[in-house]
Amino acid sequence: MAKRGKKYVEAAKLVDRASAYSATEAVELVKKTNTAKFDATVEAAFRLGVDPKKADQQIRGAVVLPHGTGKVQRVLVFAKGEKAKEAEAAGAEFVGDADYIGKIQKGWFDFDVVVATPDMMGEVGKLGRVLGPKGLMPNPKTGTVTFDVTKAVNEIKAGKVEYRVDKAGNIHVPIGKVSFEDAKLVENFKTIADTLQKAKPAAAKGTYMKNATVASTMGPGVRVDVSTLA
């Protein structure tokens, strides 16, 4: 295990690991314990009582955070004709079809999110092995396979984030930057928590939201009392 830096060790002393803080207190602590010299990302992590191995307990989707993430997302849209024009008008950085498929196959990845119209998925599907492992493959569940490219691009630019449960039942989602006002980080945090509660599978047994933590990019995790996220 990598040795923690002196600043991290000092910052970690401010966090009582046996305690679960309110969402507001946790956000305040994340700012106090941030050791990065840049505007670090604040990430929320949730441990859910689901079995991701079962198809009816896989949780995946997207939500527009009320205050965005603080990151400018570069959008690539696979579309033709009028839909391509709509994507360009909505502000997508890259719009095209076969030309971009060729570029990606050659190792081009200067984008953060991919949107595709349904009629393009036959071609885009060829990129599954390349885009899939990077979490970039368009998917109807996250609203990135759609004919409404204007809405898709607008939501991404407004701060839409995708979430997906991993094999251990965890979900990690960025909720902003340390430079954000506390109240905005808390509201983003509560928005994703509410979204996950609504996404609870009917087959999930026992405690659903087991725990939640929040941390900055290079800071220690702060445990949150999930009842304060309601």
From Swiss-Prot:
UniProt keyword Iron-sulfur present: no
SUPFAM superfamilies documented for this protein: Ribosomal protein L1 (SSF56808)
Gene Ontology biological process: regulation of translation; translation
Single GO term (MF): structural constituent of ribosome
GO cellular component: large ribosomal subunit
Presence of the UniProt keyword Signal in the record: no
Stretches assigned to coiled coil: none
Keywords on record: Repressor, Ribonucleoprotein, Ribosomal protein, RNA-binding, rRNA-binding, Translation regulation, tRNA-binding
Pfam families from the UniProt entry: Ribosomal_L1 (PF00687)
Subunit field text: Part of the 50S ribosomal subunit.
Function: Binds directly to 23S rRNA. The L1 stalk is quite mobile in the ribosome, and is involved in E site tRNA release. Protein L1 is also a translational repressor protein, it controls the translation of the L11 operon by binding to its mRNA.
Family according to the record: Belongs to the universal ribosomal protein uL1 family.
Protein name: Large ribosomal subunit protein uL1
Organism, as annotated: Bacillus mycoides (strain KBAB4) (Bacillus weihenstephanensis)
Encoding gene, per UniProt annotation: rplA
